[in-house]
Amino acid sequence: MRIHFFAFLIILSLVGCDGWQADVGKLVRKWNNQRTIDGNDIEKCIPDDGEQCTIQAGWNSTQVCEYVKCNDDNCEGGGYVLWTRYVECASSPAVRIILIITGVIYMLVLFIMVSSAADDFFSPSISSIVAHLRISESVAGVTFMAFGNGAPDVFGAIASVLSSPTPKADLALGELFGAGLFVTTMVLAVTIFTRPFKAEVFSSIRDIAFYLVALAFLAFCFVYYDHVEIWMPITFLGVYLIYVCTVILSQILHNRHKKDEEKVDEVKTVDTDSLEDDDDIYVSHGHHVLHAHEVMKMEAEIEAVEPLKTWSFRGVVHDFKEHLKPWPSMDEWDEMNIFQKVIAVLNTIPNFLFKLTIPHSEQPWSKPITLLQCLICPVFLLFCIQVCSISPFPNSPGLWMYGLILSVLLTAAVLFFTELHKEPPFYKSLISYAGFLMSIAWIYLISSEVVNVVTMLGVVSRVSHEVLGLTILAWSNSIGDLIADVSVAKQGYPRMAMAAAIGGQLFNLLIGFGLPFTIAKIQGKSISMIINPTYRLLMLFLAISLIFTLIAMFAQKYFLRRIHSYSLVFIYISFFVFIGLSLDDILVWN
């Protein structure tokens, strides 16, 4: 139990660091720009409005380029490749068009990569953790997946609030509302469409009820106050504390009920003739729902990789080849269609990098591979969250040095305290947590690059900030939620995906509003809270989507069918119809 507790704390703390990815990356790039720009260039800089990338209609290409260079903290999405700068500073219109097309193709490849990372590495790690801790799907959804999916939004809100001398609650909440509406409608709709399932009654009602209470409390604050009082964010933190206690209590009661059921031994006979007649048997392997032929392939692959007996150059090379090969087997290749073969070819290099940097709990023990991953993963994790060059203390080396020290310590521990041909105790359990952490890091690294491309498309198209925030930015910020939730749903955990979709956004709202504004009020900052018609519609349709899901669950006797997903999509489309009417002043909400 002690191992479970410390492993859980380590994962929560490190996954939380992933949330700083976009904002820390922006701050680091902005600081580097200020160091490299000389006095003459500073005069060329066109200041921004402090909130968004605002390009005026009358600017020429040189002014736009200088503005983007000086304000890449707002004009870029937080990744390493600065697409907005490349496009806006292109030497000719032809180069500009080529860069835009290249960016779109790059984004499509990134979608293939993030899908592979989620399906082949993130989901197996989640499955192993659920089996190891023996927790229900709903608890796993509102803990591991909620923290993993929600960390960027929460820490992004903290960074934006603390970096501003006069933070605005409506701007921070607008981002949380936009992501919340998209996830509770579109992401949940795709999850249900992927795998219709019977919802967990108590946990679903609990999550929706807490979410509606939080929205009602915010509506009360917006109606009667135009600024944030310190008791408001503290109340949100208190609500989240009550929510956590409710989750823990429900898990305790669930475990007791499960033990009572296990006391009753029921022996069920199986008709062997029916099994022989079944063309395609479904089995559970490592908590993944697999076809019989898939299990035979997996077992054949595992049996083909024999543990290394002695240290030899040829043996180590062969071990690397068997564990890190990024291409499918000949049997799998023959069964693929043309589209799948193209995807497999495009995914060859990414798959090799994934296997090199993400420990996999379903792979057999390999000491050389484990040594290599211990050496690479800590520093690569810092690279993913863009903090390698950050110095934690004055006059201290960057975090990359501390990561390198950790790599050496882990490598030495594996080298001296494990055997070559024998898997150490607790290896599968520990490797599941490490795989979860590294797959989350990869998903956020890829998602940040997608956000960069999407932000570039938004800046180039010159759409309004409200439309950009409600569409492109909301969608791009929720890519990780969409990929992770759909992935675990396909692997046989749709209830976990639903719990993550609703519970994760509840976590974002309660902590994303409660924590940063509590800190800001303690610092003595004045925080305005004036809601505009767009945010009112956001809150209204977010409440409508939650109430509809609650009522539809009872109407369908808790089995969520595809008609439910169609209805959620209709709600989301209706929201944009009302937004369009509001922006055109056809619908006026004073």
Curated annotation (Swiss-Prot):
Lineage: Eukaryota, Metazoa, Ecdysozoa, Nematoda, Chromadorea
Gene Ontology molecular function terms on file: calcium:sodium antiporter activity
A Pfam family it matches: Na_Ca_ex
Keywords: Antiport, Calcium, Calcium transport, Ion transport, Membrane, Signal, Sodium, Sodium transport, Transmembrane, Transmembrane helix, Transport
Signal peptide coordinates: 1-19
GO terms under cellular component: membrane
UniProt similarity note: Belongs to the Ca(2+):cation antiporter (CaCA) (TC 2.A.19) family.
Membrane-topology descriptor: Multi-pass membrane protein
Predominant location category: membrane
Keyword Signal found: yes
Domain of life assignment: Eukaryota
A GO biological process held by the record: intracellular calcium ion homeostasis
InterPro entries to which the protein is assigned, alphabetical: CaCA_antiporter (IPR051359), NaCa_Exmemb (IPR004837), NCX_ion-bd_dom_sf (IPR044880)
Transmembrane segments: 97-117, 139-159, 173-193, 208-228, 230-250, 368-388, 397-417, 440-460, 499-519, 535-555, 568-588
Protein name as catalogued: Putative sodium/calcium exchanger 6
Localisation: Membrane
